[in-house]
Amino acid sequence: MEEELRVRLNDHQVSKVFPVKPKSTAKPVSESETPESRYWSSFKNHSTPNLVSSVAALAFSPVHPHSLAVAHSATVSLFSSQSLSSSRRFSFRDVVSSVCFRSDGALFAACDLSGVVQVFDIKERMALRTLRSHSAPARFVKYPVQDKLHLVSGGDDGVVKYWDVAGATVISDLLGHKDYVRCGDCSPVNDSMLVTGSYDHTVKVWDARVHTSNWIAEINHGLPVEDVVYLPSGGLIATAGGNSVKVWDLIGGGKMVCSMESHNKTVTSLRVARMESAESRLVSVALDGYMKVFDYGRAKVTYSMRFPAPLMSLGLSPDGSTRVIGGSNGMVFAGKKKVRDVVGGQKKSLNLWSLISDVDESRRRALRPTYFRYFQRGQSEKPSKDDYLVKEKKGLKLTRHDKLLKKFRHKEALVSVLEEKKPANVVAVMEELVARRKLMKCVSNMEEGELGMLLGFLQRYCTVQRYSGLLMGLTKKVLETRAEDIKGKNEFKGLLRNLKREVNQEIRIQQSLLEIQGVIAPLMRIAGRS
């Protein structure tokens, strides 16, 4: 009995230490909905007509109502961003590869595989400018963010061209890429800065103000670069090549900040999206059919969405209300944010009183100058996000000699500026008179007192380095043309004596400098040989 009790006791202890559990079954994974996923899920799909061929490029107008330009085959179609219906079509001779809007939304530029860049008015079908210089297919075209007069384009000839649109001429050819140039972008903070990406695996940073082929910085992505975009700060850029997206710090010397390799196939397009929280996200699409949202501040993919076709292009409206993605089979996947029923945190209530107030508002008589409310209109109006700030032009205050020049009273303008005794202004007026070919005529018409002021000015400043290039030649001309008036006048003797002394002193200084140069030059040559 004792042994049987001991065995039962041991069995009881074992059952407590190792309790029997039912087999666990797989449960559906329920991800908690984040504000990020709620934001991107709020885009409601809209049906758009399928296009004939691959959608090569998408671009939204930067101004309200943010028209959409879609490049497909040899056509650019304009769509309304509100109804997503086609409003106008523009035809090209070859397949369109890129399209972009000007900062005011009045014009757009597009390039095709024939190497031609064309500029259109959105209300006209005829091209305003046709820019021909690329010797191979043109792959991208961009307007600077605020510059309305220039364009940047690049193509398979490996050349980046900076255009003067008004003159339809190339200002500078930026040479440096060793393979096809496929993408580029302009800085959001400096209209002269731009970046370009190439199939030679590099991204180059250029300054359009320097009319040479020397780039400012070079970044090696490691794979053929398909797209490059500036991030809103202007100090960071994002590059897409292969299945990776990388963020680089230009201010920090081109150092890589982070890398994302969540796509399975080549990334084809990048865009920057502005969230409701005023934060920015990097959005990418790829041939694997996925759209990825990347928080580059935390180096984390925050949202992913699958589409039933390889994706070629991406467009996001500036107001964040529309998202458009172009597929390789001509499909356009458009999404618009759902209209919320909540305004200011409270739901709209459709009661009888609101309906009556709406009717009363519609029946109110038009305001006229005879009504008191006419003079109070707009006082309580608050600015909206789509309003334009128009700066009042400040009136330019002209000096007396500027006013005289506007009236073509040349001699009076010269005498007036001589009386001010400001050498920089005097030389500026003289240069203007030289451009008008009136300087010597003014000198020949001067009275004795006015001629004395001119000689006094020449005596004091003709040897000053900043002004000597103009004043030395003018002094010689004045002495030759007014020699008879100067010789017999006692009041001019002192001025001529001082002028002669200044010129002789300048000659001695020049001779001394030449002697010093003669001594130093052989020593420099000897030092260079050793």
UniProtKB/Swiss-Prot annotation:
Phenotype reported upon loss of the gene: Embryo sac development arrest at two-, four-, or eight-nucleate stages, associated with abnormal nuclear numbers and positions in embryo sac, aberrant embryo sacs and unfused polar nuclei. Disrupted progression of the mitotic division cycles of the female gametophyte leading to an impaired synchrony of female gametophyte development. Reduced root growth and accumulation of unprocessed 18S pre-rRNA.
Keyword terms, alphabetized? Cell cycle, Cell division, Developmental protein, Nucleus, Repeat, rRNA processing, WD repeat
Q: Which residues cross the membrane?
A: none
**Tissue-by-tissue expression:** Expressed in cells undergoing active cell divisions, including functional megaspores and the female gametophytic cells. Accumulates in roots, stems, leaves, inflorescences and siliques.
Compartments (UniProt record) = Nucleus, Nucleolus
Gene Ontology biological process terms, A to Z: cell division; embryo sac development; megagametogenesis; rRNA processing
Major subcellular site: nucleus
Reading the lineage from the top rank, the first entry is: Eukaryota
- Could you give a GO molecular-function term held by this entry? mRNA binding
One GO cellular component term of this record is:
nucleolus
> Could you tell me which InterPro entries the record lists for this protein?
G-protein_beta_WD-40_rep (IPR020472), U3_snoRNA-assocProt_15_C (IPR018983), WD40/YVTN_repeat-like_dom_sf (IPR015943), WD40_repeat_dom_sf (IPR036322), WD40_rpt (IPR001680)
The positions making up the signal sequence are none
**Annotated motif Nuclear localization signal: location in the chain?**
392-399
Entry's Pfam families?
A: UTP15_C, WD40
Spans of repeat WD? 50-89, 91-130, 133-173, 176-216, 220-258, 262-304, 320-363
Question: Could you tell me which SMART domains the record lists for this protein?
Answer: WD40
Q: Sum up the protein's function in the record's words.
A: Essential protein required for nuclear division and organization during embryo sac development in female gametophyte, probably by promoting rRNA biogenesis essential for the progression of the mitotic division cycles during gametogenesis. Involved in nucleolar processing of pre-18S ribosomal RNA.
The identity of this protein, by name, is Protein SLOW WALKER 1
Q: Which organism is it from?
A: Arabidopsis thaliana
